[in-house]
């Protein structure tokens, strides 16, 4: 099962500047992944669960509830979407393995840490097809974001990536009345609108000053790079 890679910061990697992109609200939680097997002995089954780097199950501390949440809310829904789009011209046609990536988060989660008593939920953030790469953003939007049964990050921007948009995110403070993006706390994940050669889908992230200041006030300096 594929692991979700680290997303570079825009100010460290400006590859996408000037490209046609789609930007999604960056939800603040923990990465969770699920493997789906379309063929073979485990045909049309979700066969494996994991955090970013480890396999988990319903008894795993911290992620057992995420597995249970997935089975209750998403197992049938996502299987239906995949099966319905596995025909001759479907995006999942001929794919031997699918990894679905989620964010496990609550309203008060911060830097991947959850607040006791908070209600946690899973939002689908990416889908990877073995040997084909990530699903392109517009396909992701059509298949999942437009389906009310699937929680996904809000689409914030579609267009050419320029500094006006980047700076609008950096300066956004959701705690202030009249801010441009009241739902954005941490920042955005920006994805190229189409795959490049080699099934590559470049991505980058932009964080808000508000979030970075909160990080620096809550955690020791030696943790900043890891959590940013």
How does the language model describe each region?
Residues 1-228:
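Core nucleotide-handling region used for phosphoryl-transfer chemistry
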């Amino acid at each position: 099962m594929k692991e979700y890679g680290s997303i570079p910061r825009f100010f460290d990697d400006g590859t996408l500047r000037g490209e046609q992109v789609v930007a999604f609200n960056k939800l603040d939680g923990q990465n969770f992944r699920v493997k789906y097997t379309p063929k073979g002995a485990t045909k049309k089954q979700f066969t494996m669960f994991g955090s970013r780097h480890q396999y988990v199950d319903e008894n795993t501390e911290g992620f057992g509830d995420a597995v249970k949440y997935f089975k209750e809310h998403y197992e049938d829904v996502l299987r239906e979407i995949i099966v319905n789009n596995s025909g001759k011209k479907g995006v999942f046609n001929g794919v031997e393995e699918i990894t679905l990536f989620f964010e496990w988060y609550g309203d008060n989660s911060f830097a991947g840490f959850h607040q006791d008593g908070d209600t946690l939920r899973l939002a689908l953030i990416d889908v990877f097809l073995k040997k084909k790469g990530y699903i392109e953003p517009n396909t992701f939007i059509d298949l999942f974001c437009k389906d009310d049964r699937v929680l996904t990050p809000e689409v914030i921007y579609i267009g050419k990536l320029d500094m006006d948009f980047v700076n609008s995110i950096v300066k956004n403070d959701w705690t202030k009345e009249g801010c441009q993006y009241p739902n954005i706390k941490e920042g955005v994940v920006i994805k190229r609108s189409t795959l490049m050669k080699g099934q590559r889908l470049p991505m980058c992230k932009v964080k808000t000053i508000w979030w970075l200041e909160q990080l620096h006030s809550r955690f020791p300096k030696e943790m900043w790079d890891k959590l940013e």
